[in-house]
């Protein structure tokens, strides 16, 4: 009889639910019976909404499951649940409140509820002190908005929700405001709400008095797009000669130290050219979408000056302000004196503050403002009373600042810093060399003659711009080589950067010279270019740029010619006997600035004894013990009497005759044993 009772439909809701989904018209009467039962339970529940009701929870889920089968009967069911949650969500039983929310989510997934009204209700429910409920609502909100914008951007719904979230960010309940901010950040990262309105709503959270909201907003703006994390070494076929081409050229030619040096130098120049095509500093799209970055940065600076938060929060504010100034090239002159107050070697996280100073430097800042910053760094860090690491950090910071604002460097300060090229500390010496190397490309005339090095074509053409000057060219630099090659009919000859593949065979078996072609006609072309004045070169380049449509091959030739300028000596000068073996990361400026650029030490400091011991012990964790364990002939045999005697409890042995009659060693025996032990130890030490 028990099996039959389980099949009775009025009392078996799961079975009735299954049958209704299969054939809704056949079970209308059973449904109406349960619906009336639900109404009566709901009326009773409204009298005491703070009491749990398991029967009501089952009926609500039953109605939500079959809501699509009888839409005309259950048209008021979703609104009734929403009203109940809206008015009584603070007093409802947690399990019953979760059931009501799950029922609404189920109805929304079946598209029986308007998304705007439901999501607004769920945002209000984020005020509840129920962590599991908040997590469930957060997941549904993000997923639902993602599904709404799956096929196309639903601007009508998005605008309503964004306006509502803007009010939620100013809500008195910190938890609800924080969850609303998390929703917007998550939707932006998923490229669902990646518009300017979302970003500017998040900017308002940067001025919140609630620390958690402030930190979340600052962390969002200090992040990076996932696209930037891709490997920067990816190369395309149209980007000129690749590293693979150079390696193939070396592999198919003669092996020798000369060709090996040529390969290394060519690889360095190639890597430098590749880095020039990388995105600029702080390429995070959210910062670019801010409507008024100048006003935003000024408000942040005002907040920073009166901020009473922890030091870490102040550092985040400084970081964001410096990024805003660096990206948008803002005029925020009060920021630099504020940063100068913290530029002391003993200051906590001083390397990060130096990084912020470099980030906030750009060519539109008046040079006298940056000069004050440079002098502060030089006076506080680059002095002989400080350690080598402190001096290195100071020179590195000066180098990064002047790379972004070259006019700020004075000739007197540069010559003083260049003298550290012969410093006894290797880190200081190498940092000074990198600074000299930087100004060889920016403005060699500021260096003393002995520090300028052998001039190249690129260094001769280099000219430092005046304050506010724009270098707008009406021609493609290097385009003059195209017309010359056309005149000399050297279509089949490359000018020193012959591309090679695995299928090519060289007649003489030698590696192609990457510096200059040995062909007589190419030498004649090079001589014509060398003898041509700079103004005539520009005129020819402008004529070529405007008179012909350049192909990919033409652009590749131009790139190769520009790369040759950085490798070859200037006209009338001898080739360099050797090139300075600089770190490849030092060769390109204006790229992504990281803390490693400020803290770079070319020679690692010696670690103390504790660090060495910790490293040694960490390496021994996976090593097996070098102790041979005694093995039995028969592993299943019992233990011997000797083993049993060793393992026996002392309390069982203390009254034994052997223990009581045991005699200890005499003083003489102990002396002899100690002597033998010391002799044995001395032999091991030898």
From Swiss-Prot:
Query: Residue positions of the PTM Phosphoserine?
Result: 232, 234, 236, 584, 588, 594
A Pfam family it matches: SDA1_C
Q: What is any one of the record's Gene Ontology cellular component terms?
A: nucleolus
Coiled coil residues, start to end: 254-315
- Protein's cellular compartments: Nucleus, Nucleolus
Keyword line: Coiled coil, Nucleus, Phosphoprotein, Protein transport, Ribosome biogenesis, Transport
Phosphothreonine carried by residues = 551
**Keyword Nucleus recorded:** yes
Composition bias (Acidic residues) maps to: 490-508
Q: InterPro entries annotated for this entry?
A: ARM-type_fold, Sda1, SDA1_C, SDA1_MD, SDA1_N
According to the UniProt record, where is the region Disordered? Answer: 484-508, 563-586, 604-649
- GO biological process terms on file: cellular response to leukemia inhibitory factor; protein transport; ribosomal large subunit biogenesis; ribosomal large subunit export from nucleus
Q: Which PANTHER family match?
A: HSDA/SDA1-RELATED (PTHR12730), PROTEIN SDA1 HOMOLOG (PTHR12730:SF0)
Q: Which family does it belong to?
A: Belongs to the SDA1 family.
Q: What does this protein do?
A: Required for 60S pre-ribosomal subunits export to the cytoplasm.
| The protein's name in its UniProt record | Protein SDA1 homolog
> Lineage of this protein's species?
Eukaryota, Metazoa, Chordata, Craniata, Vertebrata
| Gene (UniProt) | Sdad1
């Amino acid at each position: 009889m028990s099996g039959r009772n389980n099949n009775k439909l009025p009392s078996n809701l799961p079975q009735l639910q299954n049958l209704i989904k299969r054939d809704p018209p056949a079970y209308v009467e059973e449904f109406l019976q349960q619906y009336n039962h639900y109404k009566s339970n709901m009326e009773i529940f409204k009298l005491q909404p703070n009491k749990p009701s398991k029967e009501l929870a089952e009926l609500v889920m039953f109605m939500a499951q079959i809501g699509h089968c009888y839409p005309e009967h259950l048209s008021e069911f979703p609104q009734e649940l929403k009203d109940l949650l809206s008015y009584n969500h603070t007093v409802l039983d947690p399990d019953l409140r979760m059931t009501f929310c799950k029922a609404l989510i189920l109805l929304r997934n079946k598209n029986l509820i308007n998304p705007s009204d439901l999501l607004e209700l769920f945002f209000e429910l984020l005020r509840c002190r129920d962590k599991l409920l908040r997590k469930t609502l957060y997941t549904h909100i993000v997923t639902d908005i993602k599904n709404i914008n799956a096929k196309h951007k639903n601007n009508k719904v998005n605008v309503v929700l964004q306006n509502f979230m803007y009010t939620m960010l100013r809500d008195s309940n910190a938890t609800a405001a924080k969850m609303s901010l998390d929703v917007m950040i998550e939707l932006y990262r998923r490229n669902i709400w990646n518009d300017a309105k979302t970003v500017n709503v998040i900017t308002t959270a940067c001025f919140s008095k609630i620390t958690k909201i402030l930190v979340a907003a600052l962390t969002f703006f200090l992040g990076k797009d996932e696209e930037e994390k891709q490997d920067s070494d990816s190369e395309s076929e149209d980007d000129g000669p690749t590293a693979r081409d150079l390696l193939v050229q070396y592999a198919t030619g003669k092996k020798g130290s000369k060709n090996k040096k040529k390969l290394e130098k060519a690889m360095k120049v190639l890597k430098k050219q590749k880095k020039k095509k990388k995105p600029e500093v702080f390429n995070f799209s959210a910062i670019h979408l801010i409507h008024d970055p100048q006003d935003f940065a000024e408000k942040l600076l005002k907040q920073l000056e009166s901020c009473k938060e922890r030091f870490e929060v102040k550092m985040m504010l400084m970081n964001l302000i410096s990024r805003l100034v660096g990206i948008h090239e803002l005029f925020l002159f009060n920021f630099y004196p504020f940063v100068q107050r913290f530029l002391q070697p003993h200051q906590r996280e001083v390397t990060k503050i130096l990084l912020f100073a470099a980030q906030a430097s750009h060519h539109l800042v008046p040079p006298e403002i940056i000069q004050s910053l440079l002098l502060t760094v030089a006076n506080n860090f680059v002095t002989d009373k400080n350690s080598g690491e402190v001096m290195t950090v100071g020179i590195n910071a000066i180098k990064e600042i002047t790379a972004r604002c070259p006019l700020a460097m004075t000739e007197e300060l540069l010559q003083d810093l260049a003298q550290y090229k012969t410093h006894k500390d290797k880190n200081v010496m190498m940092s000074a060399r990198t600074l000299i190397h930087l100004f060889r490309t920016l403005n060699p005339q500021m260096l003393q003659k002995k520090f300028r090095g052998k001039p190249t074509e690129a260094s001769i053409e280099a000219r430092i711009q005046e304050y506010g000057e724009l270098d707008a060219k009406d021609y493609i630099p290097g385009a003059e080589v195209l017309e010359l090659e056309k005149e000399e009919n050297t279509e089949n000859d490359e000018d020193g950067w012959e591309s090679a593949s695995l299928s090519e065979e060289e007649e003489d078996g030698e590696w192609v010279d990457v510096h200059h072609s040995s062909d007589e006609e190419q030498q004649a072309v090079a001589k014509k270019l060398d003898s041509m004045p700079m103004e005539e070169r520009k005129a020819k380049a402008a004529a070529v740029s405007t008179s012909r449509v350049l192909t990919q091959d033409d652009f590749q030739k131009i790139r190769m010619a520009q790369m040759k300028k950085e490798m070859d000596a200037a006209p009338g000068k001898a080739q360099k006997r050797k090139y300075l073996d600089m770190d490849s990361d030092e060769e390109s400026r204006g790229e992504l600035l990281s803390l490693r650029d400020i803290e770079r030490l070319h020679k690692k400091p010696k670690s103390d004894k504790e660090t060495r011991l910790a490293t040694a012990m960490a390496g021994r964790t996976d090593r097996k013990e070098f102790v041979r364990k005694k093995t039995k002939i028969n592993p299943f045999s019992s233990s011997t009497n000797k083993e049993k005697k060793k393992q026996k409890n002392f309390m069982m042995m203390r009254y034994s005759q052997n223990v009581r009659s045991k005699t200890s060693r005499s003083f003489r025996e102990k002396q002899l044993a100690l002597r033998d032990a010391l002799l044995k130890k001395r032999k091991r030490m030898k």
